[in-house]
């Protein structure tokens, strides 16, 4: 929990990405706290300080559904602890798909949403990968992975930046930040076959235009690196933004030039600073919208 001096103007709940942990958002949260914005985060199941393998991120049996419940309960506690303070939500990478799934189900009802490092892929492509991963799941140990699963997940992203210096070059071009990530004992190097399959399922559920029908009508920011393979080097993010616009959702789409996936740690080139600035500006948008009278007509807004 990161609190500003005095009463928070906004609470921003943060859901972190695959294989990492909530502590990696300290710089972002501290910067927002200087402007009266509180931040709160927790380690997702099988991540960070939670029990489980230290080499393979795995949420356990029914882990995705349990994680959605965790997110719902966490938001409820934040609302109880900070009554009257608008609640915004930020999801990065894995966290963005978890948040999107929650919103598709009408959960959380945030005052504003930030989806960072997200994207969309054709359902047919995801279905093929799912079928392959199901076969690999039978070969993998419980909570474990296989070489093919790694090749289909992180390996596919890393190949776009060959020749590779590390297993995670796709995350960012900032070598110092990348080395800190690889050396962080709370960051798992691999993803389990089971978690990858659950992620693929969530991507299919949240990718169709019908999925947007249940979303809360609140300000939305899509924020990604222009060179992020998860967002298909920007095209997948733009497609998602266009789909949201067609669904009548108030969305802003921002692609940071030269930045890869992990925009919050891409300090070299200034992408991380730009990301913090964009999020701060968007938080002001959330606050402005939340202060409007609820009985205002669309024309008056």
Spans of model-derived segments:
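Conserved alpha/beta-hydrolase "acid-adjacent" motif
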Residues: 229-239
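Active-site glycine-rich loops that stabilize anionic/oxyanionic intermediates
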Residues: 16-20, 93, 226-227
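Alpha/beta-hydrolase fold nucleophile elbow
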Residues: 82-93
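Conserved alpha/beta-hydrolase
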Residues: 29-54
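Alpha/beta-hydrolase active-site loop
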Residues: 60-79
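Alpha/beta-hydrolase-fold enzymes
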Residues: 99-186
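Catalytic active-site module of serine/aspartate enzymes centered on a nucleophile-bearing elbow/loop
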Residues: 247-301
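Short beta-strand/loop motif that positions the catalytic acidic residue
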Residues: 222-224
């Amino acid at each position: 929990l990161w609190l500003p001096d005095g009463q928070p103007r906004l609470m921003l709940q943060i859901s972190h990405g695959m294989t990492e942990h909530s502590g990696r958002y300290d710089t972002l949260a501290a910067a927002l706290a200087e402007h009266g914005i509180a931040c709160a985060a927790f380690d997702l199941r099988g991540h960070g300080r939670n029990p489980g393998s230290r080499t393979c991120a795995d949420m356990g049996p029914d882990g995705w559904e349990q994680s959605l419940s965790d997110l719902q309960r966490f938001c409820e506690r934040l609302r109880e602890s900070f009554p009257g303070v608008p609640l915004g939500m930020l999801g990065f990478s894995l966290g963005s798909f978890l948040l999107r799934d929650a919103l598709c189900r009408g959960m959380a009802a945030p005052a504003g949403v930030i989806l960072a490092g997200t994207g969309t892929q054709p359902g047919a492509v995801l279905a093929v990968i799912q079928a392959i991963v199901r076969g690999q799941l039978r070969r993998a140990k419980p909570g474990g992975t296989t070489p093919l699963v790694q090749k289909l997940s992180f390996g596919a992203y890393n190949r776009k930046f060959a020749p590779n210096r590390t297993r995670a070059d796709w995350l960012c071009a900032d070598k110092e930040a990348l080395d800190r990530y690889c050396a962080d004992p709370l960051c798992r190097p691999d993803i389990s076959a089971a978690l990858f399959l659950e992620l693929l399922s969530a991507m299919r559920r949240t990718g169709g235009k019908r999925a947007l029908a249940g979303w809360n009508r609140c300000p939305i920011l899509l924020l990604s690196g222009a060179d992020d393979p998860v967002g298909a080097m920007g095209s997948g993010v733009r497609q998602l933004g266009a789909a949201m616009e067609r669904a009548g959702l108030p969305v802003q789409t921002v692609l940071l030039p030269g930045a890869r996936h992990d925009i919050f740690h891409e300090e070299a080139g200034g992408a991380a600073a730009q990301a913090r600035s964009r999020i701060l500006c968007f938080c002001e948008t959330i606050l402005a919208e939340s202060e409007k009278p609820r009985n205002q007509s669309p024309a008056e807004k």
